[in-house]
Amino acid sequence: MDVRKDQSHLTLNQTPEAHVEKSHAPDIIGSWSLRNREQLKKRKAEAQGRQTSQWQLGEQKKRKYQRTGKGNRRGRKRQGNVEQKAESWSQTENERVQEVLVPAEEETEYSGNTATQALPLRASPTKAVPTEHCSEVPQESLQCQEITIQNHSQTHQRRDKAEALSPTTCQEIGVLQYSPKMCQDMAEPEARSPKMCQETAVPQTYSPKAHEDMAEYEALSPKMCRETPVPQYHSSKIPQDMTGPEALAPDMCQETTVSQNHSSKVPQDMAGPEALSLKMCQEPTVLQEHTLKICQDVARPDVLSSKTHQEMTVPKALPCITPGDAAGPEGCSPKTLPQSDVTPMSVTPGKNTSHPDLGTAVAEGCFSEAGECIVSEDISTKTHQEAVEPKFLSHKTYKEFTVPIVSSHKTIQESPGPEEYSPGSRHEMSGPEDLSIKTCKNRDGPKHSLPEGAQEVGGAQRQDPDAQDIEDAGAFSQDLEEGNKADQDPETPAGPQGPQKICPENDVHSSALF
């Protein structure tokens, strides 16, 4: 039993010790919960220390990057670009505001100056012209850049225009707004004569039809170019300036009318000038309708009067015309005869085709020249009375316009007439020898005037030596006839000898015409 008591006592003793141990156990051994709490506290402290250390390290690193300048390069570039843009934007806004304000103030000042002070004449036309037409402002504005500030190219031009608006500098700006050619035209309006104004105004209203007319002058044959020498010698500027009908000189009108007579297309182009009267416009149309074939069929132009026709038919109705009578109408003006001598060139082959009939050829030559003289005289006088003379065409020009065509038609009509007569009848009708001598002299008369007509037509170079040969042949025939006159009686008719001695002269004349 004592053992049990001892064991129980031990147990009792042990229990309080165990209790005591339990109270002091956390300090030595502790429970799991207490241990966990302590560990948690330690962990928290360590975490806080780590955080503080990391924060300190981060700040140190930032300070190093800021000192060395190696960190955040992209960010710095962006910040610099934004700052520069903001500065440039502010500058441009300030400049625009200044530009808007300065021209408004200076325009008010300029308007006040124009109201009080009168600008010179050279500046007045340039002021009214808008600035849209300026073509050389960038080149010319370099002269005025000394006044303006050299910041931007656009502001230079605007400030040049704005700051240079005093009455003296406005002239320079007005001159800069034009090309050099326009400046010359607009610079001195007072110094211009009316002739210069016409020259500048006509090329603007120059029609393409006038160009065609000028092209027709160049396309003429060499013979016609000789008749119209002025368009070749004039410069290209003068025909353009003088194409207006009001400014045509008399010489120019003469040459245009001569060209109408020799070409079929030119009268169509030249028929419509305003300076010609209605009747003058009708005459070229009548001449257009009569072609060369109708002229050969003996067509009569509308220009001739009935009296002219009666006089034209006289050489056919009078078969007994002697060389003396034929010598009468040969007192024509030297200006009309060369023109009629030129036109029968188309008829001369008909004269010289038959050499055996020498008397007939002589008769043809005499009658043709007599008919040509009558035609040239009557037409040159009567057509002046019938037709209305234009303002700018002289009498000489009008003769050149009408005589060559009509006289050629009538010569064609009348030249076949004397062919009906035989050589015997021609010998019987011929008068005494002194009349034939007179005929030779008179026939030599128009031949002396041939070079003058050839100068008008342009063929003087070809016909001058032939005319000298004709004169020598005429003098030789006169000497022969005077020798025969001493042998024969004055009462006997010398008809057969007269025409036979005229034959060599006719041959020389035909060769000259060819």
Swiss-Prot record:
Bias (Basic residues) = 61-79
> Which region ranges are annotated with the description Disordered?
1-96, 408-514
Residues covered by region (Necessary for nuclear localization): 7-87
GO cellular component annotations of the record:
nucleoplasm
Question: Which positions does the record annotate as the modified residue Phosphothreonine?
Answer: T322
Where does tissue-level expression of this protein occur? Expressed by bone marrow cells and osteoblasts. Also expressed by ameloblasts in tooth enamel (at protein level). Expressed in enamel organ, ameloblasts, spleen, bone marrow cells and osteoblasts.
InterPro entries, per this entry? Hemogen
The entry's keywords: Developmental protein, Differentiation, Nucleus, Phosphoprotein
Residues crossing the lipid bilayer are: none
Q: What does this protein do?
A: Regulates the proliferation and differentiation of hematopoietic cells. Overexpression block the TPA-induced megakaryocytic differentiation in the K562 cell model. May also prevent cell apoptosis through the activation of the nuclear factor-kappa B (NF-kB).
UniProt protein name: Hemogen
